[in-house]
Amino acid sequence: MDSSSKAMNGSAGGSPVGDDRKMGDHEHEFRISIILLRSFLLVLVIISEALMVTDRETGSVPLPFFGLPRPVFVTKTAKYELVTGLKFYVDALGVVIGYTVLHLLFNIGLVATKGTVVDCKSVAWISFIADSMMGYLLLSGAAVATEIGYLAEEGAPAVLWRKVCNAFGYFCTVYAISVVICFIAALVSFVVVGISAYHLFRLYGIQQQAAREKEKLSAEM
């Protein structure tokens, strides 16, 4: 009777030993993989943000005036602050950077102290939802920047929007690199979301298995 109780307590209950060990090993592997992925994601987003924020070029833009044989050239400096959509792009990257740094510190702290939150499904749910939001934020920011870049490259003759990349070639090149890196970061972020989802539902599987083992031991007693 006593040995059965010990076995049952070891497989299920408030602090199951065997289950904790299995979940703890999985938790450690999960934390290491997620730290590496988040670090890579952080580098990508920082590079994308730095490229856009520091991107500057001064050039001459032709302004046609009716009655004049030639357009008047005006000196302008191309920068992201001039376009509201690009401000959203930069702000979105900043939010993702802040979130990723906080999450990295949290995971590094858990690994360093050998802490665990495997029994707290609410934390796993919050992480999964927040990761998903960051992924969609990156994707939406990159989509907005792509549309603006297309208009800058091709113009919109129907509404008399002129091409600007012919006057700001360097700016548009750096701009394009930033957006491409942002799309890559979005893909990496969705890989992180996939790992978070796997970890979350793995917790349910392990706990359900522990419950079945407890019921089996109870039936044998």
From Swiss-Prot:
Keyword field contains Ligase: no
Compartment annotation: Cell membrane
Organism domain of life: Eukaryota
Renumbered residue ranges of the record's region Disordered: 1-22
Membrane-side (Extracellular) residue stretches: 53-91, 144-174
GO annotation, cellular component aspect: plasma membrane
InterPro entries: CASP/CASPL (IPR006459), CASP_dom (IPR006702)
Cytoplasmic side: 1-31, 113-122, 196-221
Keyword entries, A-Z: Cell membrane, Membrane, Transmembrane, Transmembrane helix
Main location: membrane
Membrane topology: Multi-pass membrane protein
Transmembrane segments: 32-52, 92-112, 123-143, 175-195
Disulfide partners: none
Family note: Belongs to the Casparian strip membrane proteins (CASP) family.
PANTHER family: CASP-LIKE PROTEIN 2C1-RELATED, CASP-LIKE PROTEIN 4A4
UniProt subunit comment: Homodimer and heterodimers.
Record protein name field: CASP-like protein 2U11
Species: Selaginella moellendorffii
